[in-house]
């Protein structure tokens, strides 16, 4: 696990861009993408660069159940706003949260991942150590699955909605085993509210109580942290 401690979001974006460039130089063609505030600075740097993704494939981590693709809080909308409208891919895959049969959708999505192994996966981490929508207690062997969001995650996401009642209670998420198949992983965290989760996933035991802790077992992980998120680490 390689740690990169940065002083600003702009610096984080440049670090992320550098990792994308290196991956492409090494032959990467399939990129696993994430949503939320954490990757925005990286996406900003990428979309302002000269990188061309028109021959590549993107596969997103997750999507809420029940939100239309054009809903401002859907992850389809997010990705179009921050990435795809500026840097399109040959194919962009995202879970279909509107599917009539979500169970079939999860199997279909696993097939997509199987046919398009991810070269570089972007991740954020939740305050409780979740990655994607894989909440504490999720099996490390999990594939793409339907998730019942925890009260903490619903509360954290409520800032994006007019009221907490509008926050979706379920999502479709790539599983932890699916994520771990990626050849390379870039995970980022910023702010003091992430410091405890960062300490636990980097220095704590590998446990399903902290889903991100499984990344200790992955052969190629880069962690981008600001000073606040890294504050509780004993080794930096």
UniProtKB/Swiss-Prot annotation:
GO CC field: cytoplasm
UniProt-recorded Gene Ontology molecular function terms: glucosamine-6-phosphate deaminase activity; identical protein binding
Q: Which residues form a coiled coil?
A: none
Q: What class of enzyme is it?
A: hydrolase
Its UniProt pathway annotation is: Amino-sugar metabolism; N-acetylneuraminate degradation; D-fructose 6-phosphate from N-acetylneuraminate: step 5/5
Annotated GO biological processes are: carbohydrate metabolic process; glucosamine catabolic process; N-acetylglucosamine catabolic process; N-acetylneuraminate catabolic process
The record places the active site at: 62, 128, 130, 135
E.C. designation(s) = 3.5.99.6
Q: Which InterPro entries match?
A: Glc/Gal-6P_isomerase, Glucosamine6P_isomerase, Glucosamine6P_isomerase_CS, NagB/RpiA_transferase-like
Would I find Hydrolase among this entry's keywords?
yes
Keywords, alphabetical: Carbohydrate metabolism, Hydrolase
* Highest taxon listed in the record's lineage: Bacteria
- Family to which this protein belongs: Belongs to the glucosamine/galactosamine-6-phosphate isomerase family. NagB subfamily.
PANTHER family reported for this sequence: GLUCOSAMINE-6-PHOSPHATE ISOMERASE (PTHR11280:SF5)
What job does the chain carry out? Catalyzes the reversible isomerization-deamination of glucosamine 6-phosphate (GlcN6P) to form fructose 6-phosphate (Fru6P) and ammonium ion.
- NCBIfam families xrefs: nagB
Specify the protein name.
Answer: Glucosamine-6-phosphate deaminase
User: Source species, please?
Assistant: Oenococcus oeni (strain ATCC BAA-331 / PSU-1)
Its ancestry begins with:
Bacteria, Bacillati, Bacillota, Bacilli, Lactobacillales
